[in-house]
C-alpha cells in the first residue's frame, strides 16, 4: 500500500511527527504551506491563527504537487487551533476533496491543550465520512519525553500498516 503524509506545521511539532511516520511506514511526505505565513510567536500567533481557524478560512497555498491516484492511504497531520483543523489543511482538503473520497484516511494532531477530537470531527465532516481510519493525538511532542512520543507514533503507524 502506497502512503503519503500531508501536513502543515507552524512550530515544528507536526513536521517532526511527519518525518517519524514517513520513516516507519515508507510514506512520501508533502508539506503544505500558505502563501502568507502565520505569526509563530506571541499573542499574534493565537489571535490570527485562532481567528482564521474559527472563521473557517481557506488561505491560498504555495504551489505543491499531489496526485492522489499514486496513493492508497493519505495521512493528514496538523496542529489544533481553537478546536479546528488548521486553515492550510482545510484548503488542501477542500481543493482535493473528490480525489480523497475513496482513500484510506488517517490523521494526527498536535496540540498544547485540547480540541483534537473536535478537529477530527470537523475533518470527518469535510470528507463526508463517518470516521477516520486511524488517529493520533500528541501534546507538544517536541517537549514530551521522546520514548513516550515514539511509542504512540509507532502504535499509530502499526494501525496505518493494517489498513487495506
List the model feature ranges, each with a label.
Residues 76-77, 107:
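Redox-cofactor binding/interface segments in oxidoreductases and associated redox assembly factors
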Residues 88-93, 119-123:
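Short alpha-helix in the alpha/beta-hydrolase fold that links the catalytic acid
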Residues 11, 36, 81-83, 112-115, ...:
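Solvent-exposed loop/turn segments at secondary-structure junctions
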Residues 131-164:
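Glycine-rich phosphate/pyrophosphate-binding loop and the adjoining helix
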Residues 106-139:
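Short, glycine-/small-residue-rich phosphate/pyrophosphate-handling segment
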Residues 85, 116-120, 149:
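Conserved donor sugar-nucleotide recognition element shared by glycan-biosynthetic enzymes
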Residues 97-100, 129-130:
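Short helix-capping segments at alpha-helix termini
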Residues 1-76, 83-85, 91-94, 101, ...:
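N-terminal beta1-alpha1-beta2 submodule of the flavodoxin-like/Rossmannoid cofactor-binding fold
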Amino acid at each position: 500500500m502506497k502512503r503519503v503524509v500531508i501536513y502543515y506545521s507552524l512550530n515544528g511539532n507536526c513536521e517532526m511527527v511527519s518525518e517519524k511516520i514517513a520513516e516507519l511506514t515508507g510514506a512520501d511526505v508533502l508539506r503544505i504551506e500558505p502563501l502568507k505565513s502565520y505569526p509563530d510567536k506571541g499573542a499574534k500567533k493565537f489571535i490570527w491563527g485562532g481567528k482564521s481557524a474559527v472563521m473557517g478560512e481557506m488561505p491560498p497555498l504555495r504551489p505543491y504537487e499531489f496526485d492522489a491516484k499514486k496513493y492508497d492511504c493519505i495521512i493528514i497531520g496538523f496542529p489544533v487551533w481553537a478546536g479546528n483543523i488548521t486553515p492550510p489543511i482545510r484548503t488542501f482538503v477542500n481543493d482535493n476533496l473528490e480525489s480523497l473520497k475513496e482513500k484510506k484516511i488517517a490523521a494526527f494532531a498536535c496540540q498544547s491543550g485540547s480540541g483534537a477530537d473536535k478537529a477530527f470531527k470537523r475533518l470527518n465532516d469535510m470528507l463526508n465520512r463517518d470516521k477516520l481510519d486511524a488517529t493520533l493525538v500528541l501534546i507538544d511532542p517536541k517537549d514530551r519525553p521522546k520514548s513516550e512520543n515514539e511509542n504512540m507514533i509507532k502504535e499509530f503507524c502499526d494501525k496505518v500498516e493494517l489498513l487495506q
